[in-house]
Amino acid sequence: SAMAAEFGRLDPVPAVVTPVYRLKSETIHNPAVVKTLLAHDGRALYFSRSAIPHVRDVDPSEWHQHTSYWGHVGMYGFRGDVLTIWDQLPASPLEDLERLEQLRLIEAGYTIATFVVEGTSLSVDTPEQLEEARLLAGAA
């Protein structure tokens, strides 16, 4: 799998790997779409429901013209030892604020590596997304 290949490519082996995809301009301000802020080496610096980074002195409708925005697919590949300690880590204030479980690892100092995939997956986290999924299922 792509996640297993990423574990083998990286040295040192990260705690977690997860796929990201390039966001379209119409989705960067949607709080139901989780955004990922990436370092130059592909490490996830932060995950948020807000558009990150914020582009100062530019109308938000034009932010996508100044930087790339990355969406989080929501699948993970974990190093074995990380799975065993996950529930022992203290609850994270950022995790509670954003309602994003991966922030617990970020705040605890663990590395989350990313790799780019084409397209996106369908998330069903809101009533609106459930309706969209029902429409897509009916069209299939």
State the predicted function of each range:
Residues 63-140:
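Conserved alpha/beta core of the MobA/IspD/sugar-nucleotide pyrophosphorylase nucleotidyltransferase superfamily
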Residues 1-89:
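Conserved core of the sugar-phosphate nucleotidyltransferase
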